Regions:
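Predominantly soluble domains enriched in secretory-pathway, periplasmic, or organellar proteins
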Residues: 17-350
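Bacterial N-terminal signal peptides
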Residues: 7-16
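Positively charged n-region of N-terminal signal peptides that target proteins for export
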Residues: 1-7
Length: 350
């Protein structure tokens, strides 16, 4: 009888906890060691871990908040996870080394590399990758499109060598991707996959990585990782401004109002905040080591960075930069998004 009572109480507690979590804003963090962790955003208490396989990378959440899409490098798959049950409902074969994921209108756009040319670091590595790119057997990366409602691939778009960041035009008709080894940003028609334009970035700096559209749709910010630069493109996809940043810029986003630009500095262990009009540096938010990706909370009061080398999550006050929480997170945290969706290096606010 006591055992049965304990079981009932435990079950009730779990149901209450699940219902509570479902009604509260949450953060999803991908870990390279093979799992996704879910946290309550108000206090960053962990709710659950979901095993997905080694190399969990980019993520995106459906518009209704019921499905989480996760790129898993080791399996070459996009996994669809039912958030309420925390069960994997679908495995979709994508290709080698799937990494970046963006969701638009319940379609997941997933970058992968058929040639499996892995990312490297440093100028020598960049030169070697260019040589590999020029080889006859080099294959451009691609962006596959998956319908989150049906779980089926509906398109496959050829990009460039080592595609990294993904963004969309304000009208939802164009796809912009940063091609690291090609040293360009390519723009494609989403409906047809046709290449519209290429923006050469190497004259301004090396290794384009992150890309994010301003909320008004008039500009795009692109990080040039090996040159400590931030490139600003106008809505016609022309270079408008070049801004110097701190050491090794990676993930980037605008705030929801479009008044500030946030840039993750992988080696400087900080997030640099710029005025979106004057491009003056407004403040520096200290984080951890190799924090490639970050998000703002839905109300934008907090910034949360996933720091892969220091194995922690850093929660900071967005305005003051004060560290509110430093959460040990072994397993090499890679990316972070929230639901309700908020602006960050991997997502945008609906």
């Amino acid at each position: 009888m006591k055992t049965a009572l304990k079981f009932l109480l435990l079950t009730a507690a779990l149901l209450v906890h699940t219902a509570y979590a479902a009604n509260k804003p949450v953060a999803f963090v991908s870990f390279s060691k093979g799992f996704i962790s879910i946290y309550q955003l108000d206090d960053m208490n962990k709710i659950a871990d979901i095993e997905v396989g080694d190399g969990a990378r980019g993520m995106g959440v459906s518009d209704d908040g019921k499905t989480l899409a996760v790129a898993v490098k080791s399996a070459g798959e996009l996994l669809l996870i039912d958030i309420e049950s925390r069960k994997i409902t679908k495995r979709i074969a994508v290709g080698k080394n799937p990494e970046f994921v963006r969701v638009l209108n319940d379609k997941a756009f997933v970058a992968y590399e058929p040639s499996n040319q892995m990312a490297a670091t440093g100028a020598d590595a960049a030169h070697q990758k260019k040589k590999t790119k020029d080889d006859d057997d080099a294959t451009p990366a691609r962006v596959t499109v998956v319908d989150l409602k049906t779980g089926k691939k509906i398109a496959d778009i050829e990009a460039g060598m080592e595609t990294e960041g993904i963004e969309f035009s304000a009208d939802g008709q164009s796809l912009l991707v940063t091609n690291e080894s090609d040293e360009n940003v390519s723009i494609h028609d989403i409906a047809t996959g046709k290449l519209i334009k290429k923006v050469d970035t190497k004259k301004h700096g090396l290794r384009p990585r992150g890309i994010k559209r301003a909320p008004d749709g008039n500009t795009f910010a692109v990080t040039l990782e090996l040159s400590d630069k931030l490139l600003i493109l106008n809505k016609s996809f022309e270079v408008q401004d070049i801004i110097s940043t701190g050491n090794v810029p990676y993930g980037v986003t605008f705030n929801a109002a479009g008044t500030e630009i946030y840039v993750a500095l992988a080696k400087a262990k900080a997030v640099q905040v710029f005025d979106a009009k004057s491009y003056a540096v407004k403040r520096l938010i200290n984080v951890g080591e190799r924090c490639w990706h970050f998000t703002l909370s839905p109300d934008e009061s907090k910034l949360i960075a996933a720091c892969g080398r220091s194995n922690n999550l850093v929660v900071a006050d967005t305005q003051s930069g004060k560290i509110l929480q430093d959460i040990p997170s072994p397993g090499t945290p890679w990316g972070i998004i929230t639901y309700p969706r908020s602006t960050g290096s991997l997502d945008f606010k609906k």
